Amino acid sequence: MSPVKVFGHPMLTNVARVLLFLEEVGAEYELVPVDFVAGEHKRPQHVQLNPFAKMPGFQDGESLHIKSRAIAKYILRKYGGTAGLDLLGENSGIEELAMVDVWTEVEAQQYYPAISPVVFECIIIPFIIPGGGAAPNQTVVDESLERLRGVLGIYEARLEKSRYLAGDSISFADLNHIPFTFYFMTTPYAKVFDEYPKVKAWWEMLMARPAVQRVCKHMPTEFKLRARTRCLCTPRGCVPCRAGDDPTQEKRPPSRGWVIICPSTSSIPFQFQQHEESACASARASPDSLL
């Protein structure tokens, strides 16, 4: 059987979510790089995979899927039984299943809207404006942190009663928190979690999982302007870039290219080339397309 294909880049939170559940179930997969800042996700080839021109694209044989949380559920339903995992709670009682559904919705509707603006302001804006010329919008950060504290207070109360959000076993709901929280914990506001000891302990349990470590190992925490190399680092090793990505085979006008530093190998897996003002406008319009 051919491995499933994930189209995107492992630094993106939605791509990382899909990779995380593939790693949890031990499924074989191929990661196909997509240069999103160069606009490859808007080209016809990718739009055939994802009509909304977002990432990831996901292909399993002739079957195409979109939306990272839906893809993750597909992965668990197809491969979770073989791996002995019931992260969706579908083999448990109706109450357990309901709790997984509830906290999955809480993550998407309450937690994500509170935490993502902080990540965007502290990581994305400085990343796409060369030289660090764009300071975070402190009003947005402060308002988001206030909202996040309200959510974390509810989480703290919940985790005083159970080991994980949906009960005493880890679930789909818990693991969906990984991508954005990972980046949040690299910001100056990570200490907010120290105010909620049960939440902090829960987060540390999640980060201790081998699958989580394999995926987060390739989610960069350092962004620098460097020369380009020819590999894409993934949880399954380095994937050579396509010939078209080889600067020796492609003539381009001089431009500043921002790259991400793979923390595990110190190699440079990707380059982004776009005028900073255009990139900033695009990011503000659709921040989820960047992380």
Curated annotation (Swiss-Prot):
Query: Mind telling me which InterPro entries this protein's record contains?
Result: Glutathione-S-Trfase_C-like, Glutathione-S-Trfase_C_sf, Glutathione_S-Trfase, Glutathione_S-Trfase_N, GST_C, GST_Phi_C, Thioredoxin-like_sf
User: What is the role of this chain?
Assistant: Conjugation of reduced glutathione to a wide number of exogenous and endogenous hydrophobic electrophiles.
* UniProt gene name: GSTA2
Q: What is the lineage of its organism?
A: Eukaryota, Viridiplantae, Streptophyta, Embryophyta, Tracheophyta
Q: Where does glutathione bind?
A: H41, K42, K54, M55, K67, S68
| Keywords in alphabetical order | Transferase
Biological processes per GO annotation? glutathione metabolic process; response to toxic substance
Residues in GST C-terminal domain copies: 93-223
| Keyword Transcription in annotation | no
Q: Which SUPFAM superfamilies match?
A: GST C-terminal domain-like (SSF47616), Thioredoxin-like (SSF52833)
Domain of life here? Eukaryota
Q: Write the protein's name.
A: Glutathione S-transferase 2
Q: GST N-terminal domain spans which residues?
A: 2-83
Q: Which GO terms describe its molecular function?
A: glutathione binding; glutathione transferase activity
Please report which protein family the annotation says this sequence is part of. Belongs to the GST superfamily. Phi family.
User: What is the top EC class of this enzyme, as a single word?
Assistant: transferase
Q: Additional info?
A: GSTA2 is said to be a defective gene.
* Enzyme Commission number(s) from the entry: 2.5.1.18
